[in-house]
């Protein structure tokens, strides 16, 4: 029986290693895709600059130069509306009675109509003509009428004045030309107009073709431009011009802001897409310039964001004008990106990467073997059926993969790998502890304890990083990079390993004087555990565990518990000094627990304490693997984050060692005093 068990485990280990190599190769290909897309586009509102010039008593050219010097590469151009055209001195809009008072010589003016005239400039005439063209597409012939009488040129429009003034008229060709003439790229932000004619779509592309500086399209509102009738034509038209569709990251940082038709349009464009980070003005005003810059910078390097849309502060800061205030925090983003190896310019578009199907199939086989190995660790009696379970799992997974091509299978296997990797790694550590449990501390000493702990930590960490290759390899394709699809079960990757390692632990170490080796033993263990007397100290301990659980589970995922200011400061410090900021639960909690758990083993501390320390070790290893579940984060960043966590955890071990030494001295001191009483 034991020989069969060893044979099964060796076979599974070989399959796991082969699968991990396939996952690592896919991850290497993924790294090259991500490394080739290192340019971030910095976008600011074109109209904000025009509006600020008059208020700040400067010229628009001076403001354009200010923003260019401070990192802005592109100008966002929105749909025009009559109100904006009036404010920019291109047209005049009158109610009927106002127009009649100004032009009594013109007959047939109706008080309930709206009248539009150009401003007497070359730009006014150009914009007036383009406005007439747009209105003819959005209104029927009976609703728009041209007037030319006694040298007066005007348009008569039927409508409600207040609503008409804010009515979107579409992207104007002249605005695109003017924005592009200042040396910036132009990012268009069209809103959908329900049931607009095909000519309106054609007019949009006429505006797109007005400048070779158009670098992207960000749809405005809850629908993509052209929805529903012409969304495919819009997608194809943009693709033919090599203009990417920009997808706005959701506020939760998971997926995108919902826009009807967006995912279909993304597929029609062959995934010629860019991820964008935008912050609301209400959020911006809560932050100082340094923190605002940090938010954009972290989004770019950690979440494959390749376009930033910068909002404006509501008020100027530090004795600067509002434009100087905005330019300063944008410059902070640019400087940090360039120091990190990025460049600013036209947004990089990732290649539409999909791994070779056979290679992914090998990674799947390894993930299945990892799950089966974990099952056998949890229920050793199943080892006699290990070959059968493995065969059924492999055949079932591969048949589903090759026949159905469903993402849910990949997501389930990735979840299984993320859960099982820390369980297997910590189980190996437990096996090591079993061999060492009879070793006295006098044979070890503090120096050897530290060295042994460091070696075990790095050994476990490397194994966890190897296991993480399954998560990365299984989910590596453009849909997951852009988060059109994503890893499912983040909370489970935190909770399930703790439950499973507890099952493994009670089979290896005695609780209540006996290990659990059968169903009856487990039932007896549960009964004894439930009959533990609740004392004040235990309640206090449970309260501490509850707080830790809240921080550990509640802070995971994308909608976690709030982060205190002192921790934000620590994070920003680590971001400044390290390539990738490690997770606190790894280097401050899980990794130092390796040393303390060994100290507990050698000094024969209570078994319950040793168990909780093993749980802490599992948290650290699980967190390393879970990092790779965020497929929007570049592979190299997740990998280096794991290494940085191990390095920082090694330093934290020094503090843990000192704390244990002090604790031992204190208990010895008070124990001796108590013994003399």
Mark where each language-model region is:
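Arginine residue identity/basic-tract feature
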Residues: 2-5, 10, 30, 57, ...
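Alpha-helical transmembrane segments of integral membrane proteins
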Residues: 3-22, 365-677
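Soluble extramembrane regions of membrane proteins in the secretory/endomembrane system
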Residues: 33-357
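Hydrophobic secretory-pathway targeting helix
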Residues: 1-52, 73
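Non-cytosolic juxtamembrane linkers/loops
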Residues: 312-391, 397-410
């Amino acid at each position: 029986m034991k020989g069969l068990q060893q044979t099964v485990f060796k076979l599974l280990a070989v399959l796991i290693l082969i699968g991990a190599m396939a996952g690592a190769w896919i991850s290497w290909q993924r790294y090259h895709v991500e490394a080739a897309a290192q340019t971030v586009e910095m976008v600011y509102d074109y109209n904000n600059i025009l509006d600020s010039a008059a208020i700040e008593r400067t010229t628009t050219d001076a403001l354009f130069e200010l923003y260019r010097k401070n990192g802005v590469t592109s100008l966002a151009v929105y749909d025009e509306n009559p109100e904006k055209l009036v404010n920019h001195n291109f047209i005049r809009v009158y109610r009927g009675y106002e127009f009649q008072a100004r032009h009594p010589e013109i007959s047939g003016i109706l008080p309930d109509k709206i009248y539009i005239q150009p401003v007497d400039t070359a730009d006014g005439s150009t914009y007036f003509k383009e406005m007439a063209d747009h209105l003819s597409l959005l209104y029927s012939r009976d609703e728009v009428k041209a007037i030319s009488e006694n040298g007066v040129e005007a348009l008569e429009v039927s409508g409600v004045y207040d609503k008409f003034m804010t009515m979107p008229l579409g992207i104007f060709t002249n605005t695109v030309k003017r924005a592009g003439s200042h040396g910036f790229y132009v990012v268009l932000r069209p809103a959908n107009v329900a049931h607009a004619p095909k000519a309106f779509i054609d007019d949009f592309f006429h505006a797109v073709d007005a400048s070779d500086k158009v670098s992207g399209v960000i749809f405005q509102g809850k629908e993509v431009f052209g929805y529903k009738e012409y969304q495919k034509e819009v997608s194809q038209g943009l693709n033919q011009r090599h203009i990417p569709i920009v997808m706005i990251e959701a506020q939760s940082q998971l997926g995108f802001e919902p826009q009807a038709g967006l995912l279909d349009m993304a597929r029609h464009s062959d995934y010629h897409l860019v991820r964008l980070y935008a912050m609301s003005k209400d959020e911006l005003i809560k932050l100082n310039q340094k923190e605002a810059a940090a938010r954009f910078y972290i989004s770019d390097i950690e979440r494959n964001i390749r376009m930033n849309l910068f909002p404006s502060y509501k008020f100027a800061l530090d004795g600067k004008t509002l434009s100087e205030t905005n330019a300063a925090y944008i410059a902070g983003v640019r400087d940090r990106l360039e120091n990190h190896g990025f460049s600013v310019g036209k947004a990089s578009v990732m290649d539409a990467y999909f791994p070779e199907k056979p290679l992914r199939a090998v990674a799947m086989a390894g993930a299945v073997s990892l799950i089966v190995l974990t099952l056998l660790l949890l229920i050793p009696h199943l080892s006699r059926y290990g070959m059968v379970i493995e065969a059924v799992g492999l055949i079932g997974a591969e048949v589903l993969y090759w026949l159905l091509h469903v993402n849910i299978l990949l997501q389930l296997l990735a979840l299984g790998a993320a859960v099982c990797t820390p369980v297997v790694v910590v189980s190996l550590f437990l096996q090591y502890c079993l061999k060492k449990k009879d070793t006295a501390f006098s044979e070890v000493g503090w120096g050897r304890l530290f060295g042994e702990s460091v070696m075990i930590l790095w050994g476990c960490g490397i194994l966890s990083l190897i296991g993480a290759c399954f998560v990365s390899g299984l989910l590596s394709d453009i849909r997951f990079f852009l988060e059109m699809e994503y890893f499912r079960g983040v909370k489970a990757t935190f909770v399930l390993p703790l439950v499973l390692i507890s099952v493994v632990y009670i089979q290896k170490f005695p609780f209540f004087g006996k290990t659990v080796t059968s169903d009856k033993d487990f039932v007896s263990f549960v009964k004894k555990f439930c009959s533990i007397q609740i004392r004040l100290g235990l309640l206090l301990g449970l309260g501490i565990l509850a707080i830790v659980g809240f921080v550990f589970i509640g802070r995971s995922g994308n909608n976690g518990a709030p982060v205190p200011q002192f921790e934000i400061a620590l994070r920003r410090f680590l971001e400044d000094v390290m390539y990738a900021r490690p997770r606190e639960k790894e280097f401050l909690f899980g990794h130092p627990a390796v040393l303390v758990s060994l100290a507990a083993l050698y000094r024969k501390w209570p078994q319950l304490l040793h168990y909780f320390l093993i749980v802490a070790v599992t948290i650290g290893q699980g967190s390393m693997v879970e990092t790779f579940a965020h497929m929007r984060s570049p592979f190299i960043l997740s990998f280096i984050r794991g290494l940085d966590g191990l390095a920082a955890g090694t330093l934290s071990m020094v503090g843990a060692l000192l704390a244990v030494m002090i604790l031992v001295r204190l208990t010895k001191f008070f124990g001796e005093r108590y013994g003399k009483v």
